[in-house]
From Swiss-Prot:
This is Protein Rev. Belongs to the HIV-1 REV protein family. Gene3D superfamilies: 6.10.140.630. The gene is rev. Transmembrane segments: none annotated. The lineage of its organism: Viruses, Riboviria, Pararnavirae, Artverviricota, Revtraviricetes. It is found in: Host nucleus, Host nucleolus; Host cytoplasm.
Length: 116
């Protein structure tokens, strides 16, 4: 794998094999039996799938040393955000292309609540 060290590749392959084995050890439930029995089997299967998913995340963190939670993206305060188009009305890559946009009045169909 490009840009990775050999040791990291081995750890990644070990983690993938282990997670694949976990998922293969939990096949989907059989469609036989009463509706209630099928529902219970699906519910238990989904619970096991959730457990396998969380175990897989822990395996990835252990083998690859990644943080458990991603670093949150820092957004500016809402007070500083605006939708004012007066400073920069062009969109990137389209400035000067096509005809200039002319503001058009919206149709008067929705203005009155009575039919004519």
């Amino acid at each position: 794998m490009a840009g990775r060290s050999g040791d990291s590749d081995e750890n990644l392959l070990k983690a993938i094999r282990l997670i694949k084995f976990l998922y293969q050890s939990n096949p989907p439930p059989s469609p036989e039996g009463t509706r209630q029995a099928r529902r219970n089997r699906r519910r238990r299967w989904r619970a096991r799938q959730r457990q396998i998913h969380s175990i897989g995340e822990r395996i990835i963190c252990t083998f690859l040393g990644r943080p458990e939670e991603p670093v949150p993206l820092q957004l500016p305060p809402l007070e500083r955000l605006n939708l004012n188009c007066s400073e920069d009305c062009g969109t990137s890559g389209t400035q000067g292309v096509g005809s200039p946009q002319i503001p058009v009045e919206p149709p008067a169909v929705l203005e009155s609540g009575t039919e004519e």
